[in-house]
Amino acid sequence: TLEETALLDYQGSQDICTLKGVDDQFRKVTAIDSVLLDGDFVLQQGEVSLAILGAGLASRLNVNHQNPYESLTVYMPNQNQRGPLDMPFTRQFAYPVGRFSIKQDYDYQYVFVSLAFIRSLVESPDAVSGIEIKLTPGADAEKVKEKILALIKTPVNVKNKDEQNAAFFKLMNIEKWISFAVVSLT
């Protein structure tokens, strides 16, 4: 996978998002189909790039994923800009074809696109920011983590699902305590 921050524009409404470029194997590794509210998890049809937006982000941008004529314009800083005459942003178009809902922070932030789409935006055909691995039932996550670290010689972060969600759980705990304090003070 490859994640990058981008600016989206849909019919004049704009918002910052995290683009998550995924390959064809993503459906097999995740339960993405179970969190789709509308549409199918298809990110490319021939030469046409498609996008699946988080429900919150789609709502903020007022996206109509059933309108085949309106595309999202996706802007990213041009990382290869050499001088003042070079374009400061790269731009690509993708058609919104569905919405997903996982949890609020994802729903208001993430957009799924094809890995090829985001690689063309960053102008790097081999760019990767993460690899997602599905373990077989009963596999020991810590042993798998150790084996991955032993295989890869460069320093990398290997996180299991609980470690990835730690920040979210910490935030939820803080919100719970703030709610408790507000109720206690009234």
Kindly label every feature range from the protein language model:
Residues 1-6, 56, 75-79:
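Generic short beta-strand segments
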Residues 5-45, 96:
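The feature marks short, hydrophobic/small-residue-biased sequence motifs that occur predominantly
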Residues 52-53, 67-155:
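Basic-flanked hydrophobic alpha-helices used for secretion and membrane insertion
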